Amino acid sequence: MQAVIPKIQFFINAILSGGQVGAVSMSSNYVIKGVLKNINGPLETIIEYGPGNGIMTKALLKLLSPQGKLIVIESNPKFVKILQKIKDSRIHIIEGKIQDVITSEKMCYIKEAGLVVSSIPFSFLKTVEREQVIEKTYALLACQAFFT
């Protein structure tokens, strides 16, 4: 039963978000393994766009070095509260829409991310916002880094 509760909670948050959440179910272990299969850790900096309830976030923490940082950007306040329950000093939560955060001073200190994982629905963004997010993300990536 405990495994079902996060799935129901995610579904309810997605439905009540007014179109701000791009998925109605959490990422499965199969999806997480597929996304991360070619990523070798430990990494110093990882950025996650749209972490939702943190299912991928927890997997990303395993790829992070002990001194590393995982920056997660989430626009849904209910998901932010869930993310805040993850007890790991390496996680830094930024609440806001990626198209606003990516151009703000909150991102100025980030240099050379080894990995950027996006779970946001780019189709929800305006063309100019989508291009801006991709351009700014590319500028954040270290040499030989991944954006998935």
Task: Locate the predicted segments by residue.
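Conserved class I S-adenosyl-L-methionine
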Residues: 43-52
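Conserved SAM/SAH-binding beta-strand->alpha-helix loop
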Residues: 76
